[in-house]
Amino acid sequence: MSIGVLVFPGSNCDRDVQWATEGCLGMPTRRIWHEETDLSGLDAVVLPGGFSYGDYLRCGAIARFAPALQALLGFAAQGGRVLGICNGFQVLTELGLLPGALTRNRDLHFICEDAPLQVVSSRTPWLEHYGTDKALTLPIAHGEGRYQCSDDTLKQLQDADAIALRYQANPNGSVADIAGITNDSGNVLGLMPHPERACDPATGGTDGRVLLQGLLS
């Protein structure tokens, strides 16, 4: 199992992801600069947190035009697994791989805390080892993590069982307490919490480890 971690100007969680996948889980991991287009040999691609291209205009709005993202569209269409964490989730919505948008938090403040979560759907390989209704805690750190979508899109997400994670205590005003969603096929997951920061007891818990182990299934 080989993992690729996309790196944009302004990414700041790419090394954390590599530490989690390679250092904690022993998965060969390759960092991919935003100008690269070669995703061959990879089983999964992770879009990490940070502030891609400074998050100018809108979070993820510029990153969507990166050459690596155009290659990612084909990778995902062929069933490749894609995980977007925080800014990576924002990029996936801008790219159109996931519906909706991430906007300013309800209270207009940056939030950095541990968030209690509930697994809503375990049909995606990322979450199948948790089981539905599993409670877990993952760190969040974002200023624009409020998930928003139309009523029609929300119904489509519900009908497709594509709401993956909900906040138990909504910290940012996300519609329907949504913390993470998948595409219809389940191979693309976007979430605002940071599983890579919860992979070792020494750094604050291991609830994220199981999610990243979904890369191996």
Curated annotation (Swiss-Prot):
- Name the PROSITE patterns for this protein: GATASE_TYPE_1
Spell out the NCBIfam families in the cross-references. FGAM_synth_I, PRK03619.1
PANTHER family found in the cross-reference section: PHOSPHORIBOSYLFORMYLGLYCINAMIDINE SYNTHASE SUBUNIT PURQ
Name the gene that codes for it: purQ
Q: Which superkingdom?
A: Bacteria
Instruction: Specify the species.
Output: Parasynechococcus marenigrum (strain WH8102)
User: What is the name attached to this protein's record?
Assistant: Phosphoribosylformylglycinamidine synthase subunit PurQ
GO MF, one example: glutaminase activity
Q: Which keywords appear in this protein's UniProt record, sorted alphabetically? A: ATP-binding, Cytoplasm, Glutamine amidotransferase, Hydrolase, Ligase, Nucleotide-binding, Purine biosynthesis
What interactions and quaternary structure are annotated?
Answer: Part of the FGAM synthase complex composed of 1 PurL, 1 PurQ and 2 PurS subunits.
**For this protein, what reaction is catalysed?**
N(2)-formyl-N(1)-(5-phospho-beta-D-ribosyl)glycinamide + L-glutamine + ATP + H2O = 2-formamido-N(1)-(5-O-phospho-beta-D-ribosyl)acetamidine + L-glutamate + ADP + phosphate + H(+); L-glutamine + H2O = L-glutamate + NH4(+)
Q: Where in the cell is it found?
A: Cytoplasm
Q: Which residues form the active site?
A: 86, 194, 196
> What is one GO cellular-component annotation here?
cytoplasm
- Give the metabolic or biological pathway: Purine metabolism; IMP biosynthesis via de novo pathway; 5-amino-1-(5-phospho-D-ribosyl)imidazole from N(2)-formyl-N(1)-(5-phospho-D-ribosyl)glycinamide: step 1/2
Where in the numbering of this chain does the Glutamine amidotransferase type-1 domain appear?
A: 2-217
The residue stretches assigned to a coiled coil in this entry are: none
Could you tell me what this protein does? Answer: Part of the phosphoribosylformylglycinamidine synthase complex involved in the purines biosynthetic pathway. Catalyzes the ATP-dependent conversion of formylglycinamide ribonucleotide (FGAR) and glutamine to yield formylglycinamidine ribonucleotide (FGAM) and glutamate. The FGAM synthase complex is composed of three subunits. PurQ produces an ammonia molecule by converting glutamine to glutamate. PurL transfers the ammonia molecule to FGAR to form FGAM in an ATP-dependent manner.
Instruction: Tell me the Gene Ontology biological-process terms attached to this UniProt entry.
Output: 'de novo' IMP biosynthetic process
Q: According to the UniProt entry, where is the signal peptide?
A: none
Which taxonomic lineage is given here? Bacteria, Bacillati, Cyanobacteriota, Cyanophyceae, Synechococcales
